[in-house]
Swiss-Prot record:
It comes from Mus musculus. PROSITE patterns: S1_IF1_TYPE. GO terms for cellular component: cytosol; nucleoplasm. The keyword Plastid does not apply. This is Probable RNA-binding protein EIF1AD. It comes from the Eukaryota. The gene is Eif1ad.
Length: 170
């Protein structure tokens, strides 16, 4: 199977399939990604541990901090105690909440994230302002400042002294 078709099937599986955790599986929240396809997660009970990403998800599905996962426990692991079996998107979270499979500890977190997403979206003004209205041409505070260049500040005293020296020399 080519890489493109593999990616297509993995993405369709994650986005389309509805997954309910079995008895041995659990829902966890991603806290951070230390690297090497490992993710630090927290359970609804507050237990923290590392989970590994299976090779079928690597370079196909991206997991970020705050995402929710369904994991299978690994008995022989000391630090890595589970393996990711499913990545939950927003639609999966909503359906699990409606069905009652969602942990109570995470329901508050999911609500806060939804509220933050709504608040972070900028509201558009009712009427667009024309370029001449309400703004002065002297106000450059909204311009991009390139921080990679040195800032040369010339004081007025130095420039007056330079002008006087040039006049005396001429």
């Amino acid at each position: 199977m080519s890489q493109a078709s593999k990616r297509k099937h993995v993405v369709q599986e994650v986005l389309g399939e509805h997954m309910v955790p079995s008895d041995h599986q659990q829902i966890v929240k991603v806290l951070r990604t230390p690297g090497n396809n490992l993710h630090e997660v927290e359970t609804a009970q507050g237990q923290r541990f590392l989970v590994s990403m299976p090779s079928k998800y690597r370079k196909n599905i991206w997991i970020k901090r705050g995402d929710f996962l369904i994991v299978d426990p690994i008995e022989e692991g000391e630090k890595v105690k589970a393996e990711i079996s499913f990545v939950l998107c927003k639609n999966h979270v909503r359906s699990l909440q409606k069905e009652g499979h969602w942990p109570e500890a995470f329901s508050e977190v999911a609500e806060k994230q939804n509220n933050m997403n709504r608040e972070s979206q900028p509201e558009l003004p009712a009427e667009p302002q024309l370029s001449g209205e309400g703004s002065s041409s002297e106000d450059d505070s909204d311009l991009f400042v390139n921080t990679n260049h040195r800032q040369y500040h010339e004081s007025e005293e130095e420039s007056e002294e330079d002008e006087e020296e040039e006049e005396e020399a001429a």
